[in-house]
Each structure stands twice: as structure tokens, then as C-alpha cells.
Regions:
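Short beta-strand/loop turn elements enriched in aromatics
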Residues: 97, 153-154
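N-terminal targeting sequences that direct proteins away from the cytosol to non-cytosolic compartments
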Residues: 1-77, 107, 111-116, 121-128, ...
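Acidic, glycine-rich loop-and-strand cores that form catalytic or ligand-binding grooves
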Residues: 96-109
Length: 188
């Protein structure tokens, strides 16, 4: 059994490396318009999905590359009301809409357990106020860590969360390509 597992693992690793190289060498972007709310340029190495997150208005992923890309949008007024209800349960919430969105999202996804955050940056994306940051979580039950990159964007009447997750290290190979996608986001 051990030899077969090693062979299958080696074949899977070789397949992943070949797919990664192909994705990097044949990269193109396609603009996707979602519900006439926003547009974003998606990389060719990700494919549309519909079963990753029921709240997401845009879902793309690559199983072989172990990358998921989601956009969740919600009315700003609903989020502000939810923040007021959450202030007693989530420490550190303040007056900044985007900081609160980041805190609530990370709290809900990771439960604040054993995470490292980094690369926090206040910025603008096509004229909209935004925050970007990365999260890393070691997972003892699997050999890989969980990597996530976020962009929290304040639109006119809507807040947007761009969530990119990977259970493997392939996200490092695609970080600059995914950054192009984040920076292409525009509200319509």
C-alpha cells in the first residue's frame, strides 16, 4: 500500500506542477459582469463554480491548483446594522466600516484561533476605498497551511468582500496574477 500511495502522490504532484506551469504560461483575463453591480477580470486558470459559498455573487476556483476566489456583496445598510448587533461579541470593532468588515469576516471564517495577519493596507481600487490583508493559519490535521487574501471594498451603497483561499502553497505562484484581478474590480 505504501508504494502505491507514493506513486499516486508523485503523479498528483507532477500533474499539479504541469498545470501550474501551463496556467502561468497561458494566462489570459476575461472581464465578468455580475448582476450589473460590478465587473472584475478573472484569470483563465480559474473556472466558474456555483457550490463554494451560497452568499457569494461570484465563485471561481481551480481544484488542481487549490485556489478559490469569491466575491460577496451586501447592502451597506444591512452590514452596518449587523455590526451594531455584533459589537458585544466581537472585540475591537470601531467606527471604520472596512476595518469592521475585515474583523467580522476573519472572526467568522477563522474564529480568531491561531491566525497570523499581515500585509494590511488601506488603498483605493478604481476610486473606491478598500483594505487588503492576508491571513495565514497553520492546520495540524493537514500537511498544508491555510492561506487567505482579502480585499474589503466600500461601494456607493454596497460593501464587497473579495476572498481568495488556498490550502496549498500554489497561491504564492499566483499572488501577482490574483492581485491584477483584485485591482480590476469596479463598481458599475
Amino acid at each position: 500500500m505504501g508504494i502505491i500511495s507514493a506513486l499516486v502522490g508523485g503523479i498528483m504532484d507532477a500533474t499539479r506542477i504541469a498545470k501550474t506551469n501551463k496556467a502561468l504560461n497561458e494566462l489570459t483575463y476575461e472581464e465578468v459582469v455580475v448582476q450589473n453591480k460590478y465587473a472584475i477580470k478573472m484569470p483563465s486558470f480559474l473556472s466558474p463554480k456555483s457550490n463554494l459559498n451560497e452568499d457569494a455573487s461570484l465563485q471561481y476556483a481551480s481544484r488542481i491548483l487549490d485556489i478559490a476566489f469569491l466575491v460577496i456583496d451586501e447592502p451597506k445598510s444591512e452590514f452596518i446594522a449587523a455590526i451594531e448587533e455584533s459589537k458585544e461579541y466581537i472585540p475591537g470593532l470601531g467606527d471604520s466600516l472596512l476595518d469592521n468588515l475585515a474583523a467580522v469576516t476573519i472572526h467568522n471564517m477563522f474564529d480568531d484561533k491561531d491566525i497570523e495577519t499581515g500585509n494590511y493596507r488601506q488603498t483605493t481600487i478604481n476610486g473606491l476605498n478598500a483594505i487588503t490583508l492576508n491571513v495565514f493559519q497553520e492546520r495540524t490535521f493537514l500537511k498544508d497551511a491555510l492561506y487567505a487574501s482579502f480585499a474589503f471594498i466600500e461601494g456607493k451603497d454596497t460593501v464587497y468582500q473579495i476572498i481568495i483561499m488556498s490550502g496549498g502553497t500554489s497561491i504564492k505562484n499566483f499572488a501577482d496574477k490574483l492581485e491584477v484581478t483584485i485591482q480590476s474590480f469596479r463598481e458599475l
